[in-house]
Design a protein with these regions (language model features):
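A short, Lys/Arg-rich alpha-helix, primarily the initiator
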Residues: 1-23, 27
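DNA major-groove recognition helix of helix-turn-helix/homeodomain DNA-binding modules
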Residues: 47-67
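Signal-transducing coiled-coil/dimerization helices and immediately adjacent hinge/linker segments
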Residues: 83-90, 260-338
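Regulatory sensory and allosteric helical modules in signal-transduction proteins
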Residues: 140-201
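Regulatory loop-to-helix N-cap segments in sensory/regulatory domains
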Residues: 231-246, 264
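Allosteric cytosolic regulatory segments
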Residues: 247-254
Length: 338
């Protein structure tokens, strides 16, 4: 075999054997087609993925493959990448300690904000240590009227790394339903992974500007309170070990919610909603509506807490948006939600 000029050329030679391609894909935790996209430079692997590739490739190629990768990735180091990989595989002990301390020592009305902030920060540090571009959102079930079903989710927390940090912080007030990956994960009751949007078979779950997306329901005793959404601007970004990590974080996010915020599966019947752009006008008056409700409640001598007024406004807006006819594009399915 002539000496390969790049790690992509060498990998192309290795995976020319279909069985070896499948073996490598299984060992790395990616789709076999992902390896082909690496070879053709259609997709950029993470350092952690390259480390796994070097470790599991045929022994006769490992040294050359490592050297070729280092030529293209100047900051690539097997030692550093191994550290990144190990750090990304499990929730750190100190995160568990911090969350339990919040639950034990702080007022209940601060639990959601403090716990969600701690967990989102820890997730970003683990899932995107090199600031590639990852966004995280927590979308809670919108509280339904008595005896009614949950029809939508709404964003209650999140953050991101550039360039998704600004987008995540801006997209605070809007509703999603069954048309979103987050809503679909809640409906089916399990983690969903879309690792390459361009070739995916579920166009109605695509997200504008996003190449990889994960959504995991936040559950307790079989009931659901929210969906944890994690997205990246890179295709094939999330390894199998990181899907397990995201599930672990979703279990911890459940500690941020109160008992009454969880709903039995039969009470969750998500509907399709207009896209975020069409919702902006409605939500531009969100805070104004909250203040009006609180003022009326005070005049009626039945004052409301801010959270109670916000719940009522979410319900009002949900009802209004469910009555809005979907556009042709929305009915056919391309959405822009996390």
């Amino acid at each position: 075999m002539a000496e390969a000029s790049s790690w992509r050329n060498l990998l192309g030679t290795i995976i020319s054997d279909p069985q070896e391609r499948q073996r490598l894909a299984n060992a790395i935790g990616v789709n076999p087609f992902t390896l082909t996209r690496w070879v053709t430079n259609q997709s950029l692997p993470r350092r952690e993925s390259l480390l796994r590739l070097v470790k599991v490739c045929p022994p006769q190629y490992s040294a050359l493959l490592s050297n070729l990768i280092a030529q293209e990735w100047e900051d690539f180091s097997l030692t550093d990448a191994a550290g990144d990989l190990q750090a990304a595989e499990a929730v750190p002990t100190e995160v568990y300690t911090d969350v339990l301390a919040i639950k034990a020592t702080t007022p209940q009305n601060t639990h959601f904000w403090m716990i969600s902030q701690r967990l989102v920060s820890a997730m970003l540090k683990q899932l995107d240590p090199h600031n590639v571009g990852v966004g995280i959102s927590i979308l809670a079930c919108t509280k339904p009227a008595a005896g009614k079903s949950v029809r939508s989710l709404h964003v209650v927390g999140g953050d991101g790394t550039a360039p998704l940090k600004q987008k995540t912080s801006e997209a605070v007030a809007y509703l999603v339903g069954i048309e979103s990956l987050a809503g679909y994960a809640v409906t089916v009751g399990r983690l969903l992974s879309l690792q390459h949007m361009e070739g995916d078979r579920l166009p109605f779950l695509k997200i504008a500007g996003i190449e990889s997306a994960i959504a995991c329901p936040v559950k307790r005793e079989g009931r659901t309170a929210a969906s944890l959404s994690v997205v990246s601007i890179q295709a094939d970004y999330f390894l199998q070990t990181q899907l397990t990590l995201i599930e672990s974080y979703a279990n911890l996010v459940a500690l941020a919610f109160t008992e009454e915020q969880f709903y039995e599966p039969e009470r969750i019947r998500l509907s399709a909603l207009p896209d975020q752009q069409r919702q902006r006008l409605s939500f531009s008056t969100f805070q104004q509506r909250v203040k009006q409700l609180m003022n009326v409640a005070v005049r009626n001598q039945h004052p409301l807490k801010v959270t109670e007024a916000e719940e009522q406004v979410w319900q009002q807006l949900e009802g209004e948006l469910l009555d809005v006819p979907l556009s042709t594009e929305e009915e056919s399915g391309t959405k822009v939600y996390p």
